[in-house]
Amino acid sequence: MFNDIIVNVKGGSPPLIKILVKGAVSSSQMKYIQLPFIIILSILASCSDADFDIVIRNGTIIDGSGYAAYTSDIGIINDKIVKIGDLSKQTTKRTIDATNQVVSPGFIDSHTHAIRGIFDVPTAESSLLQGVTTLTDGNDGTSPHPIDAHFQKIENAKISPNWAVFVGQGTIRKEVMGLENRDPTTSELSEMELLVQEAMEDGALGISTGLFYIPGSFSLTSEVISLSKIAASYGGIYISHMREEAADVLKSVNETINIGLEAKIPVQITHHKIIGKENWGLSKETLRLVDDAIKGGLKVSIDQYPYTAS
């Protein structure tokens, strides 16, 4: 016959420690049981009393706010930063010495096509080893469909980085109209709007276009505005591979800004560049257009990739 000796550590429920002792336990025998209990409880208490789970000490912090780099400690509890400052007198379960190292938030890669490889290499070391912890996909008007099924696949794959997607205007158009080069009917436009609504409700960041590519190139500006209004109603953004990045780049920037104004949606001009040596210098004008739009109250941003493509 075994008797249970159950000890609650700091009032924990259910009990954290349970020992089975064969036969009755006399008071004289209890002293031999109490000593290991005391040791175990002391160890557990010392662990649970730590101020932080992790402290990153003496790192050069660049926090993304625009402020200059500074040296400090970072305290983490339950995977969340809870304090930044001098934590030299605080206790921690684990210490990371970041002396002469840079500590920053993980980078967000705002334009990827990582869906082409994320299921083959779910750990995504090529991104993580560069400090990129969030990948966005669904760019250039092409996205997974439907979004909710895609997120379930991502969840099942247990990928390492954070993951976000846009709903692609080209994907939605193709779903409703195929690759036909014409304007949508009223009912077709309504169907596309409903699909954008469903995607936003399933967690899309916003709507993307690839107006340089088929079938996005078949779409009038008014069609894009209608779909962007749906995304805007859910707090989404509009990100675009514009129609033209060469001689007519100014028209494309103006179109992109106009979509933002009409749909009342923040705008991101993706991989902005000027293609063709004969067009170099037009970036002065494109940036002026963007600056003017920002001064007028529209949220406009630009991303670029760090390699030659013009």
Residue ranges and their predicted role:
Residues 7-17, 23-25:
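Positively charged N-terminal leader segments that act as targeting/secretion signals
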Residues 31-38:
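Sec-dependent signal peptide recognition
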Residues 44-46:
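C-terminal motif of bacterial Sec signal peptides marking the signal peptidase cleavage site
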Residues 51-54, 61-105:
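Histidine-rich, glycine-flanked metal-binding segment
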Residues 98-103, 107-112, 120-209, 228-229, ...:
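Divalent-metal coordination cores built from histidine and acidic residues
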Residues 106-117, 238-244:
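Histidine-centered catalytic micro-motifs
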Residues 184-209, 215-310:
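Histidine/acidic residue-rich metal-binding segments in metalloenzymes
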